[in-house]
Amino acid sequence: GEEEYQKMLENLREAEVKKNA
């Protein structure tokens, strides 16, 4: 659902931040 989708996007964003750090 929409909530799961938003959580998934949040997780992807966090992964990108950690990768770029």
Swiss-Prot record:
A divalent metal cation binds at residues 10, 14. The modification Alanine amide is found at residue 21. The record marks 5 as: Important for selectivity. PROSITE patterns: CONANTOKIN. Conantokins inhibit N-methyl-D-aspartate (NMDA) receptors. This toxin inhibits both NR2A/GRIN2A and NR2B/GRIN2B subunits of N-methyl-D-aspartate (NMDA) receptor-mediated calcium influx in central nervous system neurons. Induces sleep-like symptoms in young mice and hyperactivity in older mice. Keywords: Amidation, Calcium, Gamma-carboxyglutamic acid, Ion channel impairing toxin, Ionotropic glutamate receptor inhibitor, Magnesium, Metal-binding, Neurotoxin, Pharmaceutical, Postsynaptic neurotoxin, Secreted, Toxin. One of its GO terms (molecular function) is ion channel regulator activity. Belongs to the conotoxin B superfamily. This is Conantokin-T. It is found in: Secreted. It comes from Conus tulipa. Expressed by the venom duct.
